Amino acid sequence: MPIIANDYTWEQSENDVYISVPLKGTKASASNVLCSESYLKVNFPPFLFEAFLFAPIDDSTSSAKIGNGVILFNLHKKEPAVWDALTLAHMEKEEMQKIRENAVAKEQEKAQEETKAKAERKRENEKYSLEVTMKIDEVERKRIEDVKEEERKKATEELEKWKEKQRIQKLNEMIQKKQIRQENERNKALHTGSLKHCSTATTVQNDRTINVKQKEKILPPTRSTGCIQIQFTPRVFPTALRESRVAEEEEWLHKQAEARRATNTVDLGLEDLTEEEKNPEWLKDKGNKLFAAGDYLAAVNALNLAIRLNNKIPGLYLNRSACHLKLRNLHKTIEDSSKALELLTPPVPGNASARIKAHVRRGTAFCELELYVEGLQDYEAALKIDPTNQNMKSDAEKIRRVIQSSLPDIERGIMLDIKDL
């Protein structure tokens, strides 16, 4: 049971009440204070101080300070007046208990309100943080959009420059063709005039000779001049006709022509593209430039669009396989190389170089995947097309040594060379 502390002092003014309660050696952290309109309690075990105030106070403006072993209360009266005493006298126990319970209930309600207010402040702070984050994201998004717009403008300017260059090139070609045609017509006219003049002069001279030597001997007339037209057989491939395979070459040319005419942007939903962007050859050139600049992913995107427009051109798959090889997409390299080899049929001298590249790239990808037997098969297929290529011979020999050797150090050394092919 606590000990009631009665050794307190108090004084008042018309508006305030000042109370001093000694803690009697108790630590300040061990004391508990409860203050309401009509009740004041200080619990500092084993002592207890409580006061049932003479009149109501404003607990929101009242204060308590702990220091030097004393608790000092500054209580602000609700109505200015001089109290007859600090506490009410002759109170019943039931009334005192009721005042205590009301004070505790109000303190709990006040604590709940403070908790709610704290939670509300926390929500406001989180809302403010979210708004600030959204503003930062909006600024970053705007910056990214500006960068994209700048890149789009640059690409548009490059495209316009390319169009102008193509227009000037076509104009120059037309002018050159016109000049060549005029020059040919002029030479033809001069040649025809020269033939007529020679024929007339010969006729006059012959007449004179006949008149002079008619008595001696009559000679036959001079043979008239003429032109023999020679037309050579048109040949797309540089090989001699006796060494070529005409049927296979014609089939290859026919397939190439059909592939160039196979573009259809309407069915693919690409009607919004410009005329240049609908041209697979233009996209192929764009991919080559991006590849040369080291932007392999952008080159793949350009070639993807070109293949969507026309999936019958082997050069698109061949170039994309090179990009995938640079990006270490080895399985895609194998797929594109295989597709290019399917389209590079029938095998003719005109597509020999492309077939060599397809075999070498697929073989390199197989070796990177440690499928050395399959890689060696592709290198040997490339050597059948060009048996004089010393680099491919050296690479094939290295792969054979990797297959035949079981030493890990040797294998690592050879793989390093294969990666540098």
From Swiss-Prot:
A Gene Ontology cellular-component term: dynein axonemal particle
UniProt-annotated stretches for the region Disordered: 103-122
UniProt-listed SUPFAM superfamilies: HSP20-like chaperones, TPR-like
Stretches assigned to the CS domain: 3-87
GO molecular function: nuclear estrogen receptor binding
Subcellular location: Nucleus; Cytoplasm; Cell projection, Neuron projection; Dynein axonemal particle
Source superkingdom: Eukaryota
InterPro entries with a match to the protein in the record: CS_dom, CS_DYX1C1, Dynein_assembly_factor_4, HSP20-like_chaperone, TPR-like_helical_dom_sf, TPR_rpt
Alphabetic keyword roster: Cell projection, Coiled coil, Cytoplasm, Neurogenesis, Nucleus, Repeat, TPR repeat
Pfam families given in the database record: CS (PF04969)
A Gene Ontology biological process term: epithelial cilium movement involved in extracellular fluid movement
Main location group: nucleus
Job description of the protein: Axonemal dynein assembly factor required for ciliary motility.
PANTHER family: DYNEIN ASSEMBLY FACTOR 4, AXONEMAL, DYNEIN AXONEMAL ASSEMBLY FACTOR 4
Protein name, UniProt field: Dynein axonemal assembly factor 4
Organism (species): Xenopus laevis
Lineage, top ranks: Eukaryota, Metazoa, Chordata, Craniata, Vertebrata
